[in-house]
Regions:
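Phosphate-end processing signature that detects enzymes handling 5′-triphosphorylated RNA
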Residues: 1-166
């Protein structure tokens, strides 16, 4: 898989049972400098760290997307947030790590038992209060994974669930 390729699947969350499984959580504030349907430029502040991220579906097929991310100075991020498009997002992100099984993925690779997969569950605040989404990042589009009981309907690829469109 190319270094700048991100493969994520996104789901609605039907209960708050994930909170008991979370190993950590942190606050995120993010805004967008560009929200073109095929590419986004995002500024994100996560606690005391900040990142500039470019995502695009132009160079990839399926659910894989190009992603480039660079850590930037917190002061620079705060200045960039001032020029972001309206509709900044505030959310709490919960991290849930789960053990992988011996799952076959495309080609000859396998994910050994003990390898961990990571769920990121976002609980939105402010104008998006009540929205809760979960994402899992995979190494291959065909990689299998166990679905937790708290997971709801899959919404991967549905534009209304892209953070940039909320």
């Amino acid at each position: 898989m190319a270094k700048n390729t991100e493969i994520e699947r996104k789901f609605l969350v039907k209960s708050d049972a994930f909170i008991a499984q979370a190993t950590t959580s942190y606050e995120i504030m993010q805004g967008y400098l560009c929200k073109d349907p095929e590419k986004t430029i995002r500024v994100r502040i996560r606690d005391t760290r900040a990142f500039l991220t470019i995502k695009s579906s132009l160079l990839r097929d399926g659910i894989a997307k190009f992603e480039w991310e660079k850590e930037i100075d917190l002061s620079d991020a705060k200045e960039l947030m001032k020029i972001c498009l309206p509709g900044a997002i505030s959310k709490t992100r919960y991290i849930i790590k789960v053990k992988g099984e011996r799952l076959k993925v495309k080609g000859e690779r396998t994910k050994d038992k003990g390898d961990s997969l990571k769920w990121e569950v976002d609980v939105f605040h402010g104008r998006l209060e009540g929205r809760v989404l979960a994402e899992i990042e995979l190494s291959d589009e065909d990689e299998a994974f166990e679905r937790p009981d708290w997971l709801g309907e899959e919404v991967t690829g549905q534009p209304q669930y892209y953070n940039a469109n909320m």
